[in-house]
Amino acid sequence: MTSTTLVKCACEPCLCNVDPSKAIDRNGLYYCSEACADGHTGGSKGCGHTGCNCHG
């Protein structure tokens, strides 16, 4: 059995942990969603994951 190492999403207020092999990689930082990776531009709130209401 292989274990997966999860890392915290690079969006500071985000609560999500992501698998680096499935995350969005921007400049070596791993994000759980495009909203987080884009810095919540345009006032987007939340990353779409249950229980997380990050706003960048």
Curated annotation (Swiss-Prot):
**Induction entry:** Upon exposure to a range of metals, particularly cadmium, zinc, copper and mercury.
Domain of life, per UniProt, equals: Bacteria
Report which residue ranges the record marks as coiled coil.
Answer: none
Sites binding Zn(2+) 2 sit at C11, C36, H40, C54
Residues reported in the UniProt entry to bind Zn(2+) 1: C9, C14, C32, C36
Q: How far does the signal peptide extend, from start to end residue?
A: none
Give residues annotated as binding Zn(2+) 4: C16, C32, C47, H49
Q: Which SUPFAM superfamilies match?
A: Metallothionein
Please tell me where Zn(2+) 3 binds in this chain.
C14, C47, C52, C54
Transmembrane regions = none
Q: Which GO terms describe its molecular function?
A: metal ion binding
> What biological function has been recorded for the protein in this entry?
May play a role in essential metal ion homeostasis (especially zinc homeostasis) and resistance to certain non-essential metal ions. Binds four zinc ions.
**What is the similarity comment for this entry?**
Belongs to the metallothionein superfamily. Type 14 family.
Q: What protein name is recorded for this chain?
A: Metallothionein
What organism does the UniProt record list as the source?
Synechococcus elongatus (strain ATCC 33912 / PCC 7942 / FACHB-805) (Anacystis nidulans R2)
